[in-house]
UniProtKB/Swiss-Prot annotation:
Record-annotated active site: C64
Domain of life: Bacteria
Coiled coil, from the record: none
Enzyme's top EC category: transferase
Source organism: Pseudomonas syringae pv. tomato (strain ATCC BAA-871 / DC3000)
Keywords, sorted A to Z: Cytoplasm, Transferase
One GO cellular component term noted in the UniProt record for this chain: cytoplasm
Gene3D superfamilies tied to this protein: Rhodanese-like domain
Protein name: Thiosulfate sulfurtransferase GlpE
Name of encoding gene: glpE
Gene Ontology MF annotations: thiosulfate-cyanide sulfurtransferase activity
Reactions the enzyme catalyzes: thiosulfate + hydrogen cyanide = thiocyanate + sulfite + 2 H(+); thiosulfate + [thioredoxin]-dithiol = [thioredoxin]-disulfide + hydrogen sulfide + sulfite + 2 H(+)
Amino acid sequence: MTEFKRIPPEQAQALRAQGAVLVDVRDAQAFQSNHIPDSQHLDNHSIADFIANADLDKPLVVVCYHGNSSQSAAAYLVGQGFSDVYSVDGGFERWRSTFPEETAQG
């Protein structure tokens, strides 16, 4: 894959169930308040370590607030060598309305 794919929350949930890595690019306070279980917070401070330790061929799902910033982050990650990258349309807000029981705090 040379570009990322935009997907709905339902497809992101299916990928998550299959072992995809989920990263959340919202600010730290929003992530602490509520996020997708097992997702990792990714920001300018953690991205270098994340890339260095990642399996570049494992599916990677990127989520933000509403599905806009995640597209830029997904494109960047494709440029860093990730081969199977997805951006969640509607972001965390759409995820939360689709799967209200599939959120975590802390």
